[in-house]
Amino acid sequence: MDPEETSVYLDYYYATSPNPDIRETHSHVPYTSVFLPVFYTAVFLTGVLGNLVLMGALHFKPGSRRLIDIFIINLAASDFIFLVTLPLWVDKEASLGLWRTGSFLCKGSSYMISVNMHCSVFLLTCMSVDRYLAIVCPVVSRKFRRTDCAYVVCASIWFISCLLGLPTLLSRELTLIDDKPYCAEKKATPLKLIWSLVALIFTFFVPLLNIVTCYCCIARKLCAHYQQSGRHNKKLKKSIKIILIVVAAFLVSWLPFNTFKLLAIVSGLQERYFPSAMLQLGMEVSGPLAFANSCVNPFIYYIFDSYIRRAIVHCLCPCLKNYDFGSSTETSDSHLTKALSTFIHAEDFTRRRKRSVSL
């Protein structure tokens, strides 16, 4: 097969396709053959353990389950499925891009990465919408924020993500270049580039805009609530801090690589091309950040969500009485939702009184 019939920029696993136009440098080889295998091994070990503990803690915890926990469990499951394929990519990077595990795993692992990417973005979007409904529209959200609705939404996300991953499954193949096996993508046609551009916009940038918008509205509502109630010191700072960290982690993990991917697709559709070396370097540097997102989520939840922290400690050390759940399963979210509901009812009551007086 002609090396020029491979593409380097249509996947979320940046360097899975060889690019014969870019020569290896002395600094590039240690990065791909030494740093990346070590980095991916660390991501694999911490991510598998962290997501297993997170799923077990939330699934087997005593008491009722929060609605947000359903999305978190599915997100952890998606990350875990992806992380299982990481040893294949460790071997690939250690062997300087050679794929030594056969065609089935070439297609299957690439498909799992695509499904994980879509599933993660959609679940994070649903979690932001859930927080938005719970905090900004607590009264109206009671009709939609139900357990059965959450399960239906998660099942739909998995189904849609599996469908969106099919183009990757069909386009990946094990090809020989200079008698060496590579897990590569077939040549990108103009139609495929257009599809990739549309898919990237609607499966990443639109959800990203949704997430940022939801959390901005949440922050605005929290500021208004705490200023009105007179409690705007520690609680306000903590709530805003968690929101900013969640948004920042998402942006740092996904935005750099998808930006380079967007530039690469646009470059392929236009006569003027961006320097291929620049795009390759950008994807090689930003790609591991997207991979690492699958292992950092459990740590973010453990550090910043006291409810999940108690669940994990209770799961690992049931004998610790200080972390017992007790009879109450309410969290800061539920307390805040109740407070905002009361606040909204009070606003409505005041508004109606003013209207009746004016009449």
UniProtKB/Swiss-Prot annotation:
Protein location: Cell membrane
Any GO MF annotation of the entry: C-C chemokine binding
Pfam families from the UniProt entry: 7tm_1
Membrane topology category: Multi-pass membrane protein
Native source species: Macaca fascicularis
One cellular-component annotation, GO: external side of plasma membrane
Transmembrane portions of the chain: 34-54, 70-90, 121-141, 150-170, 193-213, 240-260, 284-304
Intervals, Cytoplasmic compartment: 55-69, 142-149, 214-239, 305-359
Entry PTM: Phosphorylation is necessary for YWHAE binding and efficient surface expression.
Assigned keywords, A-Z: Cell membrane, G-protein coupled receptor, Membrane, Phosphoprotein, Receptor, Transducer, Transmembrane, Transmembrane helix
Assembly, per entry: Interacts with adapter YWHAE; this interaction promotes ER-to-Golgi transport of GPR15.
Protein name: G-protein coupled receptor 15
Family that this chain belongs to: Belongs to the G-protein coupled receptor 1 family.
Taxonomy, superkingdom: Eukaryota
Tagged with keyword Secreted: no
Residues that bear Phosphoserine: 358
Function recorded in the entry: G protein-coupled receptor that plays an important role in immune homeostasis. Acts via its natural ligand GPR15LG, a chemokine-like polypeptide strongly expressed in gastrointestinal tissues. GPR15-GPR15LG signaling axis regulates intestinal homeostasis and inflammation through the migration of immune cells. Controls thereby the specific homing of T-cells, particularly FOXP3+ regulatory T-cells (Tregs), to the large intestine lamina propria. Also required for skin localization of thymus-derived dendritic epidermal T-cells.
Record Gene3D superfamilies: Rhodopsin 7-helix transmembrane proteins
Extracellular compartment residues: 1-33, 91-120, 171-192, 261-283
Transmembrane among keywords: yes
